[in-house]
Amino acid sequence: SAKEMNALQPGTRSFAQFDMDSFANVTNDNDNPYLADMTKKAIELLNSNENGFFLMVEAAHIDKFSHKNILEGSTAQVIEFNKAIQVAYDFASRDGDTLVLVTADHETGGITYNEETGEYYYTTKSHTGVNVPVYVSASDAGFITGEAYDNYCISTQLARVMGYDKSQFPKTK
């Protein structure tokens, strides 16, 4: 619950499970926290680590609504995700040593705009091959504006920024 989450103290280990279907309801008429609330609390808890931290925040309901072609739902979830991004960005701006990276693993639904009717519509209920953007809050993170990246390169670049050498990565086939 939001109450239990807010009671957590830095240094406390926590594994949280929330009623995931309730995240689809952005009016939040239950006791689950919003994604932005969870992001803020996670940063608060993780920031006490003197070695820094890595936090991944996912907004899975954007994809779930897009698979069902529910524009209002996916749009509402993008707005909620944007609030969580703003929490992270505000922290990074104050901290001065934090990078915020926002991306997606794929696009779903093929949302398209019809100029004649002024309406948006979906072209599929599946994932598309459309490139997804990568937004980075720091210019020295090694990403080049306008450049396309294979998604596996993002983790390599992030690891480099965090001080890890590629030779430390496990070998894959």
Predicted regions located by residue number:
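A post-motif C-terminal structural segment
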Residues: S1-K173
